[in-house]
Regions:
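Bacterial N-terminal signal peptides that target proteins for export
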Residues: 2-12
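Acidic, serine/threonine- and glycine-rich low-complexity intrinsically disordered segments
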Residues: 146-252
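C-terminal motif of bacterial Sec signal peptides marking the signal peptidase cleavage site
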Residues: 21-24
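Tryptophan-paired
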Residues: 68-139, 204-298, 327, 333-337
Length: 337
């Protein structure tokens, strides 16, 4: 497992704490007066380094690429959204790590405010954004500080994430005086997009998946876990005679591994992309080996060409490739052909 890298999209939670006065106890349990403190949360979007329109405009510059970019814009903007749909807040006592308070709030905006009440104590606050909205990720171990995780659906192959996932962790010492805290919500997933140019070659279909990305994220210590193996099925769009295979996933490991390829060679990669091209009378499978890690909050675009045999040839020299000609469907990952 690896520590998360603070990259890309960020939201900020500003926390202001003040002693509760008598008027704040109206309509509340009076036994709590003098023991609880009012915590006012302000959730707002601060900046978005991963600006999808800017990245697509910079990377996809030809007329054909711009047509493809118009098809990629909506799904990628949803992943790298500038708003939060919902917020899941957990307050754990320290040092025991037991859950003391839990709240969920619908936001659907870049800015929201609400109030919670906490007793004088040391806490660690863990905040999750969009974890409920994302159907392929579950919140697990929510009753204990060190077990709270974002976990992908357990399966050999899953679809691409559709939402950006954000988390924060904040140590809080509630004392009988006014205080303020600031906690950043960082994006914990990412996305990659393969741009495929078939040229004059007649391609009947394209499918693919992303491999070697994390499956779980431990929120309290900000680490990704890779013990389970799940590949993420890429989504296909087309435009301008080009194909785009995009997938939103968790990040890859930081350190590349060495793989033995089917071409009796070795390749180093932090993550891999599998692509199957259907030609008129055959299938060709290409595995791309990407040595540069895929970071949290990042949108990575890799351009390739499809040659007359259906092989995918990357434009980047540091991306390796191995090819299986006359590949047979079945017995591989469950991807649409």
């Amino acid at each position: 497992m690896i520590s998360t890298l603070r990259y890309g999209v960020r939201f900020v939670v500003a926390v202001a704490i003040a002693t509760a006065c008598l008027t704040s106890c109206i309509d509340e349990d009076l036994s709590e007066c003098g023991e609880n403190y009012t915590i006012d949360y302000t959730v707002r979007h601060v900046y978005q380094q991963t600006d999808v329109p800017t990245i697509l405009e910079r990377e996809l510059t030809t007329d054909a690429e711009r047509q493809l970019a118009s098809q990629l814009l909506t799904p990628l903007n949803r992943v790298f959204a500038t708003t939060v749909k919902e917020l899941d807040l957990s307050f754990f006592g320290k040092p025991a790590g037991n859950l003391i308070r839990h709240e969920q709030h619908e936001i659907n905006a870049a800015y929201a405010q609400y109030t919670v009440y906490l007793k004088k104590l040391d806490y660690r606050n863990l905040a999750l954004a969009n974890a409920i909205a994302e159907p392929l990720v579950d919140i697990k171990g929510a009753e204990e500080l060190n077990s709270l995780m974002l976990c992908q659906t357990v399966a050999d192959t899953i679809d691409s994430h559709t939402e950006g996932l954000f988390t924060s962790r904040l140590d809080m010492s509630i004392r009988d005086k006014s205080q303020s805290y600031h906690a950043d919500l960082y994006m914990q997933n990412c996305a990659s997009c393969l741009v495929l140019d078939p040229g004059d070659n007649k391609v009947m279909g394209v499918s693919g998946y992303v491999d070697d990305t994390a499956t779980d994220f431990a929120v309290s210590d900000s680490t990704y876990h890779f013990a389970r193996h799940t590949v993420v099925r890429s989504s296909l769009v087309s435009g301008g005679g080009l194909y785009g295979l995009y997938a939103a996933t968790m990040p890859s490991a930081d350190t590349p591994k060495t793989y033995n390829t089917r071409n009796s060679t070795t390749e180093k990669a932090a993550w891999r992309i599998g692509v199957v091209v259907r030609m008129a009378d055959s299938y060709t499978k290409t595995t791309l080996y990407v040595p540069q890690p895929l970071k949290a909050g990042e949108l990575r675009i890799i351009k390739c060409k499809i040659n007359s045999r259906g092989e995918v040839v990357p434009n980047l020299q540091n991306v390796g490739a191995s090819v299986e000609l006359d590949w047979k469907p079945g017995g591989d990952h469950n991807i649409d052909l």
